[in-house]
Amino acid sequence: MPQLELSAGVVDYEDTGGDGPVVVLLHGVAMDASLWDEVVPGLSGEYRCVRPVLPLGGHRRPMRAGADLSVPGVARLVAEVLERLDLRRVTLVLNDWGGAQALFALGLGERIGRLVLTSCEAFDNYPPGLPGRNLVAAARLPGGLAAAFGLLRLRPARRLPMTWGRMSLRPVPARLMDGWLRPAQTSPEIRRDLRAYLLGVPPREELLRWAEALREFEGPALVAWAAEDKVMPVEHGRRLAALLPRAAYVEIAGSRTLIPVDRPAELLAHLRDFLARTDP
């Protein structure tokens, strides 16, 4: 997997290459780029798909001690990825992680031509739902993250409401989830990075100001929300679509937050339609 040296450390990324329009796909906490494994093959023939592994707990290379891994800090790293790879007019696709509103609030959206938000953190929904609150509570306790991720070695524990049970209707394949969880289960430095992110969420008032910054994005946008989401409220998807001046809104039935896991074919169809009928 290729690597990029960023201000916070070295990040891995996947890149299908090619001369087509660029689609950058981002994942959430305690995941990695493989979240999109069932979606990218349907795009890569026409689009260059870039998938960075963000330092959100599923990454395999610890960041530098003391690096800014707060929500705005990780948003700045996304902007660095786009700059280092000289990517312009990209279509930025997010699932679970809500960093888009931070990117625009920080004035870092100049390389983004189109935006796709799929069941992600928004407004003041940080940490999101019961799983998010449970993870932040663990991060505040000495040894809490080690215990929380140790519990997830037991596969039945992964379907509990306070862990991953509310994130998808069907279980995340064990191969994927084993890979997502292993870094935080085995590396104190990865847990340190994750703790920095989880405890680096700004106050509610600032989060709401960030969301308002999305009004300034003038490019085409698609908001695709899971109709049965238990973590990212469906109403948030509708509100995001109302904020974005050129947004289309769709709800995807039979899915919770992790639409790329629950309904990859339906999500791919919506993505391809959006990409075909809009220009960055």
What would you call each of these model-derived segments?
Residues 9, 29-30, 50, 55-88, ...:
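Flexible "cap/lid" subdomain of the alpha/beta-hydrolase fold that forms the substrate-access gate
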Residues 246-280:
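Catalytic active-site module of serine/aspartate enzymes centered on a nucleophile-bearing elbow/loop
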Residues 94, 98:
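Gly/Ala-rich beta-loop-alpha elbow adjacent to hydrolase catalytic centers
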Residues 7-15:
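A short loop-to-beta-strand scaffold at the N-terminal edge of the catalytic core in hydrolase folds
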Residues 15-61:
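Conserved HGGG/HGGXW glycine-rich cap/lid loop of the alpha/beta-hydrolase fold
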Residues 2-6:
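Short acidic-hydrophobic surface loop/beta-edge motif
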Residues 37, 103-104, 268:
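Short, hydrophobic alpha-helix immediately C-terminal to the catalytic nucleophile
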